[in-house]
Amino acid sequence: MQTIERTTLSELVGNEQYARKVLPFIRGEYFGDRTERIVFEEIQKFVEKYNALPTKSSLEIEIDSRRDLNEDDIRRVLTVVKELENDKDVNFDWLVETTEKFCKDKAVYNAIVEGITIIDGKDKARGPDAIPS
């Protein structure tokens, strides 16, 4: 089943117009799955460094050379990269609108979780006064 996360990753690799429009607003923390987050971070690093979209091959090479991942992690992340398929028929406006909603929903969710962590006293760096009133 295709998810918005996988669709986003696929389009970030194969659709330059989409990538230029949405990449500045997407954060790694929006990806709940660690393997998808790693793929996103590699795409983001590549675009920042080369001002171009990465190919699946360049992503595979970059991921394979990471020293912070064990072999099992690398294998899972490379599987995600291999499964990325750009959908040439996807409606651009729908794609951007759906991605914007995904980003907003994840940002709100993450803020709520962070607030609960602070209220529960599990955040050692911030107390309840860190939550805006």
Positions of the model-derived regions?
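Noncatalytic partner-interaction/assembly domains of nucleic-acid and motor enzyme complexes
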Residues: M1-F102
